[in-house]
């Protein structure tokens, strides 16, 4: 995905991701409703869909004649090549691992309020993720544009891109906050309805958690994504690690 993004093939990334999502949903539906399989087969569906993405990645990586085409002859593990990559990547790796661990700790702490709260928190995070995933897409694209302008010495345009990105991210967060809260009932109904029947208590808990989660997530996280795009574009990954901690 990183190579395709560097090539500027955002449409190819979109097509691949959409196909993987459709493939995973189709296989999962077949396993559950067609074969009446257990929950383990959901993981199998994920493996199959990700395996397809892996095969396509290898194919796209080895095809073409541009600078990003994979070649064993071009592989060099020299310090001037590896060190900058590690210096930029390591803080990002630590940041993402710490973020994942933080979510795990929060979910673990919520066990004191009962299993219903834990489930509601997880579902609320998934619903809120609809907004954050879109914002992350703008973040990735914005970081690339800022980095390109910085490399070309056009700092003014790079900063202009950042301020435009702030407006886009905040506006997107506000719009999605309104939409998701309006349709919170129908969305959460899908999660509160199971083989055991409709659980109104569980749905109300999901909505209650989501109200606060979205209030502190949609717009603020959008602005945060714009700031992260600016820092990534200028190569300040150590600063992003400090800010997120």
Language-model regions, residue ranges each:
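Alpha-helical transmembrane segments of multi-pass membrane proteins
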Residues: 1, 15, 197-227
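Small-residue-rich hydrophobic transmembrane alpha-helices
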Residues: 1-13, 120-184, 221-235, 239-243
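Hydrophobic alpha-helical transmembrane bundles that constitute the permease/transmembrane domains
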Residues: 3, 7, 18-26, 47-55, ...
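Hydrophobic/aromatic residues within transmembrane alpha-helices of membrane transport systems
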Residues: 4, 9, 19, 31, ...
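Membrane-interface helix-loop junctions in multi-pass transport and translocation proteins
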Residues: 11, 21-55, 186, 238
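Interfacial/gating helices of multi-pass transporter permease domains
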Residues: 39-44, 80-88, 109-129, 161, ...
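Interhelical loop/hinge segments that connect adjacent transmembrane helices in multipass membrane
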Residues: 43-46, 55-99
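Short membrane-interface helical motifs at transmembrane helix boundaries
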Residues: 175-200
């Amino acid at each position: 995905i990183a190579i395709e993004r560097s090539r500027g093939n955002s449409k190819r990334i979109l097509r691949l991701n959409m196909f993987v999502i459709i493939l995973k949903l189709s296989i999962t539906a077949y396993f559950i409703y067609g074969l009446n399989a257990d929950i383990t087969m959901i993981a199998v569906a994920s493996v199959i869909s990700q395996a397809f993405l892996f095969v396509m990645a290898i194919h796209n990586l080895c095809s073409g004649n541009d600078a990003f085409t994979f070649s064993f002859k071009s592989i060099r593990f020299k310090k001037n090549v590896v060190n900058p990559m590690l210096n930029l990547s390591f803080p990002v790796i630590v940041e993402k691992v710490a973020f994942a661990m933080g979510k795990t700790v929060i979910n673990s702490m919520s066990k004191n309020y009962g299993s219903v709260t834990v489930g509601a928190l997880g579902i609320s995070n998934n619903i809120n993720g609809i907004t954050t995933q879109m914002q992350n897409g703008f973040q990735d694209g914005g970081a690339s544009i800022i980095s390109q302008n910085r490399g070309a010495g056009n700092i003014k345009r790079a900063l202009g891109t950042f301020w435009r990105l702030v407006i886009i991210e905040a506006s997107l967060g506000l719009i999605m906050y309104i939409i998701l809260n309006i349709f919170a009932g129908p969305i959460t109904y899908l999660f509160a309805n199971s083989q055991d029947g409709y659980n109104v208590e569980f749905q109300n808990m999901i909505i209650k958690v989501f109200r606060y989660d979205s209030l502190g997530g949609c717009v603020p996280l959008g602005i945060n994504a714009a700031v992260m795009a600016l820092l990534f574009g200028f190569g300040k990954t150590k600063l992003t690690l400090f800010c997120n901690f």
